[in-house]
Regions:
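Basic, Lys/Arg-rich alpha-helical nucleic-acid-recognition elements, primarily the DNA-binding modules
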Residues: 1-5
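General N-terminal leader/first-domain-start detector
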Residues: 7-62
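Hydrophobic protein-protein interaction segments
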Residues: 50-384
Length: 384
């Protein structure tokens, strides 16, 4: 506590807690489960299904949790379920429930969130916007059809300044409006009310921007995904990345790439040509001192042991042989000597194996595995 107080006084509270928030986001990024996780299937309460009241007042968080629980379970059991959320990602009960679901394949979840225009912190000194981003990632990890929309506003003014029930959860046959602290609310089942709220939600959504859409890196959509990563921002700007293992793809060129590549894939020639061009672009940036990667010794050792990298789905290539691994490590050593590759120190020397993140210009790319082991790529461009 004494050292923390000293650091706050020396650096300044805002700068200190911003850095700690980023550190917390990186160190606690959701990792792929060690064993297969397929979610849970539940059955809605019979009492909830039989209660057909059009309007019910909810006077405690326990009551709200009960109705939210039943709404979500009922919708997840439908053939074409749809859940619409107009609230911040600070309702832990709801987001834990959604992340644990094993719904029908056709369930769609959409959410509208307010992104703060000012730097604000939560009660535990976390950057509000960054904590919200961390809260929604388990839904992507679970493999849900989840779409996140956002708009800019002052969060405090929108949710906490005498606004009557600013939060809404909407399903096919029910709606719940509640306060921002999830303590009181109103539950609706009237068809007329539901149609009005649905139209209102759609009108709001049309005024918002889609935050990002993770795309699976597969042979079928390789062109779109690789193109989003190696775009004009990549070519024109310095690249700064953080990931468990050193970035190895710049060394996958020429004979090595052709030897390790899975030539049995559909469109193999096109995939190989695009990959070689992209990886060569990375090597050119290293030579031009425009490529800086921060990684861990643990991640590099994992590659040494397995001959695999989490940057590329396993379907695209064969594990590297011992000789090929040595060849790649020689390239990594040269990059360490030039300063392009650097190893993280405490407390970031034990990164989650699932985090691969890079920034180039006003764009960012994140690569992660979901609970089923599929690799997804998501890119975000910031407009200033």
């Amino acid at each position: 506590k004494l050292k923390e107080s000293w650091d706050v006084a020396r650096i300044g509270a805002d700068a200190y807690y911003k850095r700690k928030s980023v550190e917390s986001f990186i160190c606690n990024f959701p990792d792929q489960p060690s064993s297969e996780f397929c979610g849970c299937s539940f059955t809605p309460d019979v009492t909830y299904a039989e209660n057909r009241s059009d309007c019910i007042s909810l006077t405690s968080q326990q009551l709200i949790n009960y109705y939210v629980h039943q709404m979500i379970l009922s919708e997840a059991d439908r053939d074409s379920g749809e859940i619409s959320l107009f609230l911040q990602p600070d309702y832990k009960f709801l987001f834990n429930l959604l992340a644990s679901l094993n719904p029908s394949d056709s369930l769609k979840i959409s959410q509208i969130v307010c992104v703060g225009t000012e730097t604000t912190f939560t009660d535990d000194h976390q950057l509000t916007n960054l904590k919200y981003l961390h809260s929604v990632f388990p839904l992507y990890m679970a493999g849900h059809d989840y779409s996140l929309y956002y708009y800019y506003d002052k969060i405090e003014a929108h949710y906490h300044s005498f606004n009557l029930y600013p939060c809404m959860i909407l399903t096919s046959d029910a709606a719940l409006l509640c306060s921002s602290d999830y303590q009181t609310g109103i539950f609706f089942r009237s068809g007329e009310v539901l149609r009005m709220l649905k139209n209102l939600y759609i009108s709001y959504q049309e005024q918002c921007t889609l935050f990002f859409t993770p795309a699976p890196l597969t042979p079928e959509n390789h062109a779109v995904v690789i193109g989003s990563m190696f775009d004009s921002d990549f070519a024109e700007n310095d690249l700064l990345g953080i990931q468990p293992e050193s970035c190895l793809t710049p060394f996958f060129t020429g004979t090595l790439l052709r030897e390790m590549f899975n030539h049995d894939l559909p469109n193999a020639d096109a995939i190989l040509a695009m990959a070689e061009q992209a990886f060569q672009m990375s090597m050119d940036k290293i030579k031009n001192q425009q490529f800086f990667i921060y990684s861990t010794y643990e991640g590099l050792l994992q590659f040494v042991r397995s001959g695999r990298t989490d940057e590329i789905p396993e379907i695209f290539y064969h594990p590297l042989t011992t000789e090929q691994r040595i060849q790649v490590l020689e390239g990594v050593c040269a990059c360490c000597e030039s300063g392009a590759y650097r190893f993280l120190q405490k407390p970031l020397n034990h990164l989650p194996g699932n985090l691969h993140f890079c920034i180039r210009g006003n764009s960012g790319t994140m690569i992660f595995k979901n609970n089923a082991g599929k690799i997804f790529v998501t890119s975000k461009r910031q407009s200033w």
